[in-house]
Amino acid sequence: MRKPVMTVLFGLLLCISFSCSKDEKTEPSGDDAEVPPMKESYPGLSVSSSGELLLNGEPYQGIGVNYFNGFTRTLEDGSLYDDTYRAGFTYLKERNIPFVRFSLTGFWPKNWDLYLNQKEKYFRSLDSFITAAEEIGIGLIPSFFWHTPTLPDLAGEPVNRWGVTSSRTHQLMRKFIREVVVRYRDSPAVWGWEQGNEVNLLVDLPGDNSNLPPVVPSLGTPVSRSKEDKLQTADLNVMMTSFAKEIRKYDGTRIVISGNSIPRFAAWNLLHQKQWTPDSREQYVAILGIQNPDPVNVLCIHAYPAAPSEGYFSDETADFNGLIRASVDASRISHKPLFLGEWGAQETEYGAQTRTKFMEILNAIENNQVPLSAMWVFDYPPHDTENGINVSPDNGPREYMLQEIMKVNERMANR
């Protein structure tokens, strides 16, 4: 889910995550030659040769939550030692919520200041976050580059340099991946690595001067954008394959996730025909594979219920359950387990029917045996009123959402 500018500014500074105790970490220099050798396997989630999701070597199904600013809140001015995430982790653990997905880096270029200028403090804060997850028993899926334009902006390049492996953007990406993965790869709290958030919604959009990334110079963006700040599927392919290959230099087993949303309703036709023609079910399955290229080894979507009049495919009537069924079918074809990285029911849209809609989504997840999913969103106050979708100790009426997830997690564990 993309955040409005002011909401993101409020909730989204820098982010990284994981850890072991300080004396167990291995911090790489800028030279790969000094990185300690990679182990045969690491804790967390992996994928079997047949495409089955495993946790520490055993088949796994589970539903977690998005703890979007769980770490980034600590990087706001005066909040470096804010450890309220400990209470959040404990609250989730008591409800059998096994893992969280969260933003690992700053949304805007300005939000990278701590990492760029006071790296030791940045990692000290992240160490504390990871250690808390280890102690309380919460798994972590960090999303590295939540706002796609930010890394190129920091590198002083247009956004489409994500599609050029020799770019400064990729150089910065590789450096950051090395520092994070080598530092935290031994942590049992780390379950997987995710590239970013909904990059696929940015590709193949028509027009040279439309659908451009936002411009907020006070937060570090350029003063203007051009057609070079737009992405194509070819750029996405380079982004994802390069990210996954870099992860594999230092961690050969954990899952690597794109962080993609459900493809746009015309994604296949935008790629091949440059037209907003709705995709068929077959085209939807095909574009999922294209947008989650090897060595990314998970199919990722973010999905919220469509209006009954919209549907999902041009050639059949499909409700949310039908969408999930098609996505699971695609995952079996590709031998990549499905990660429904965001899902939820918004009170601002469904009102008194929110609980019914929530259960419809949850039933689709359970009935289709989706191996991994994460509800949007936990303990993110801006979405209390903006979307009516936040679940936290402060809004008791939505506690039922975690209670229902807990029941499904218990049934999944007992199968």
Model-derived segments and spans:
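Hydrophobic faces of well-ordered beta-strands that scaffold small-molecule active sites
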Residues: 61-65, 100-102, 140-142, 191-195, ...
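Aromatic-lined substrate-binding rim segments of carbohydrate-active enzymes
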Residues: 78-154, 159, 179-181, 228-259, ...
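Aromatic-rich peripheral "rim/lid" segments of glycoside hydrolase catalytic domains that contact
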Residues: 168, 350-415
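Bacterial N-terminal signal peptides that target proteins for export
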Residues: 1-8
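N-terminal carbohydrate-binding accessory modules
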Residues: 26-101, 113-116, 124, 131-135, ...
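C-terminal motif of bacterial Sec signal peptides marking the signal peptidase cleavage site
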Residues: 16-19
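Bacterial signal peptide processing site
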Residues: 21-23
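Extracellular glycoside hydrolase catalytic/binding regions
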Residues: 44, 174-178, 182, 189, ...
